[in-house]
Curated annotation (Swiss-Prot):
Keywords: ATP-binding, Ligase, Nucleotide-binding, Protein biosynthesis. This is Aspartyl/glutamyl-tRNA(Asn/Gln) amidotransferase subunit B. InterPro entries: Asn/Gln-tRNA_amidoTrfase_suB/E, Asn/Gln-tRNA_Trfase_suB/E_cat, Asn/Gln_amidotransferase, Asn/Gln_tRNA_amidoTrase-B-like, GatB, GatB_C_1, GatB_Yqey_C_2, Gln-tRNA_amidoTrfase_suB_CS. It catalyses: L-glutamyl-tRNA(Gln) + L-glutamine + ATP + H2O = L-glutaminyl-tRNA(Gln) + L-glutamate + ADP + phosphate + H(+); L-aspartyl-tRNA(Asn) + L-glutamine + ATP + H2O = L-asparaginyl-tRNA(Asn) + L-glutamate + ADP + phosphate + 2 H(+).
Length: 475
């Protein structure tokens, strides 16, 4: 029997607010254990939560970006369960009345566009963290307790592991463009649970699902879903029954293992939190936040292609990250040369970022300096070859590119007399190649140009060298 894979994703997006969701403690990642805590985080008797307004605004922003319905009235609820890193014995979340509902995300995979519909987006707080790798004991770090999350829940519209990864990457791109999260999966800023099931092709009812947790990269999301789909298929084909449960992905072993039976909503005994008033979102807030939304990747890529005359592919690459798109656009503005700016950002800049594991925000050559280098090329002060040498110097030298060129004697030689002398020396030194060229092997022009550039240590004006050689070789 042929089966169809059915996947729905629950994504927890950690917001990059300065303070936590319900208190004034810092939400910064990486601090010493139990230093970003207060009576609210520790659930001490009498401590009362106060909702962080920024959390509400961030929820509305992503709701607008994903074309959701924004609820004018939503309720914060208590999700009751026991776990050592949950000091209150409940998690503040939303249940019957989330802040956002419906909406969708469009993804492209292998040239095919698909729309993944959303059920809801709701506000909740993160739990603390259990630490198991210190001796034989388990410790609890409550720095993360109360850090704000948005849970984004999709319908089971996803039909392949690669599509799940594409959906997650698109969602990450959107939250980063909005500036509400850094989307770092390795640090847990973006966490994904996958609900996986199989059903016979053509069937309308869903099969029994399992939930997969502990996937900390796009590749692991793909591998975990593929493994679980294969496990389901083997069970069904052997006449077995799928158990509804939560399973943990083990990346080292490349398999899932049973963690616990899958809970249902009623197991959590949700009820409105009596310590928190309902969340009210009026039209004035919505209209104000609409004006704060950025230009999203697809629209920005179309504008780059139209306004700057760069290929569609280049425009797509340059707009994958908002900061990279900003960097490129600032470089164009300062250099006045869109095509050369595109070539340099997609070439030397992105190569360096990859080699040094840097984000564009950490890159030492800011747009003004790169634009200065591009202008030196445009004004024929230096060649492209020399420009790459200058670029390498600029990585560790704060001097302006023009100052580096002057200091290191890298200016392009355009003295026709000097270049004619070098060209004649090269021709005289290579009589065999000269004869072959004049017999019709015109591709040897590259050889002669290369020899001239080598003698001039790359500083000769290549177009002028080419013109001089052509005249001499054809003479």
């Amino acid at each position: 029997m042929d089966y169809e894979l059915v996947v729905g994703l629950e994504v927890h997006c950690q917001l990059n607010t300065v303070t936590k969701a319900f208190c004034g403690c810092s939400a910064q990642f990486g601090k010493a254990a139990n230093t970003n805590v207060c009576p609210v985080c520790l659930a001490l008797p009498g401590a009362l939560p106060v909702l962080n307004r920024q959390v509400v605004e961030d929820a509305v922003k992503i709701g607008l970006a994903l074309d959701c319905r924004i609820a004018p009235h939503s309720v914060l609820a208590r999700k009751n369960y026991f776990y050592p890193d949950l000091p209150k014995g409940y998690q503040i979340s939303q249940f019957e009345e989330p802040i956002c509902s419906d909406g969708s995300i469009d993804v492209e995979l292998d040239g095919v566009n698909r729309t993944i519909h959303l059920i809801r987006i709701h506000i909740e707080e993160d739990a603390g963290k259990s630490i198991h790798d210190i001796g034989d004991d388990t410790f609890i770090d409550l720095n993360r307790s109360g850090v704000p999350l948005l849970e984004i829940v999709s319908y089971p519209d996803i039909r392949s592991a690669k599509e799940a990864s594409a959906y997650l990457q698109k969602l990450r791109q959107i939250v980063k463009y909005l500036g509400i999260s850094d989307g770092n999966m390795e640090e847990g800023s973006l966490r994904c649970d996958a609900n996986v099931s199989l059903r016979p092709v053509g069937a309308t009812e869903y099969g029994t699902r399992t939930e997969i947790k502990n996937m900390n990269s796009f590749k692991n999301v793909e591998k975990a879903i593929e493994y679980e789909a294969l496990r389901h298929r083997e069970i069904l084909e052997n006449g077995g029954v799928i158990i509804q449960e939560t399973r943990l992905w083990d990346a080292d072993k490349g398999e899932t293992r049973s963690m616990r039976g899958k809970e249902f909503a009623h197991d959590y005994r949700y009820f409105p939190d009596p310590d928190l008033v309902p969340v009210l979102v009026d039209e004035a807030m919505i209209e104000r936040l609409k004006l704060e939304l950025p230009e999203f990747p697809e629209m920005r890529a179309r504008r780059f292609a139209a306004d700057y005359g760069i290929p569609t592919y280049d425009a797509g690459v340059l707009t994958v990250e908002r900061e990279l798109a900003d960097y490129f656009e600032e470089t164009v503005k300062l250099s006045g040369d869109a095509k050369t700016s595109s070539n340099w950002v997609m070439g030397e800049v992105m190569r360096t970022l990859k080699e040094k594991y840097l984000d564009i925000a950490e890159f030492s050559i800011r747009p003004a300096r790169l634009a200065g280098l591009i202008q030196l090329i445009h004004n024929k002060v230096i060649s492209n070859t020399i420009a790459k040498q200058v670029f390498e110097v600029m990585l560790n030298d704060e001097a302006e590119p023009a100052a580096i060129v002057e200091r290191d004697g890298l200016a392009q030689v355009s003295d026709s007399g000097a270049l004619e002398a070098v060209a004649q020396e090269v021709i005289d030194a290579n009589p065999k190649q000269l004869a072959e060229y004049r017999e019709g092997k015109t591709k040897l022009m590259g050889f002669f140009v290369g020899q001239c550039m080598s003698r001039m240590k790359g500083k000769a004006n290549p177009q002028l060298v080419n013109d001089i050689l052509l005249k001499k070789l054809e003479g």
